[in-house]
Amino acid sequence: EPYAASLWAPEGYVPQRVVSVDIAAPNLLPDNALPYKGGICLAIDHHGSQEFFAERTCLDADAAACGEIVYDVIRALGASVTPEIAMALYVAVSTDTGCFVYTNTTARTHRIAAELMDCGIDVGAVNKALFRTKSAVRLAMEARMVADMELYDNGRVVVMSIPLSLCRELHATEADIEELSSLAALVQGTDCGITLREPKPGRVKI
């Protein structure tokens, strides 16, 4: 968060190069990146569903996180990893792997995380902020989703929903909603967790 302010371009800024990270298709770009949609010169990604929409693509479908790929690129260039860079990469790797619990996590993932930790970052503070602390709105969202969840096939399929009306009622932000899609899969005995979100009236995202 202390470095977030430096990530926003000033009004009227025209970039010489545009790089997308962790984006498999142009329709997944956030709204503030849409002006650059047709001019992305490099896409760095780890999704096998990559649509190769950029001029060049750096793809490693075996990587658990794009942070791993960026780390490898930095090392290949012979550049140093500062504590600030290490912090950003650790956040990228830990969030993409669900704090190293998703099945895509590999031994290499842990080795890279260890090297980033050696750069002097406060891993405890990062993990607490990302994985052990939730806003009151986020907890209220989870409570309503659990209360309204639907079970199918003897509990093997769990369906949860995030209606637009709920987001408006609780004044939820994108930060409150982020990663809620994984909640359905936490129910014991579940083989398939499905989350339906209504981002706009008449539109449902699965």
Name each region found by the language model.
Residues 1-35:
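N-terminal small/polar loop signature for handling phosphorylated ligands or for N-terminal nucleophile
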Residues 6-10, 30-33, 57-60, 78-80, ...:
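A generic local secondary-structure boundary/capping motif
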Residues 37-40:
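A short helix->loop->beta-strand "cap" motif at the edges of active sites that frequently abuts
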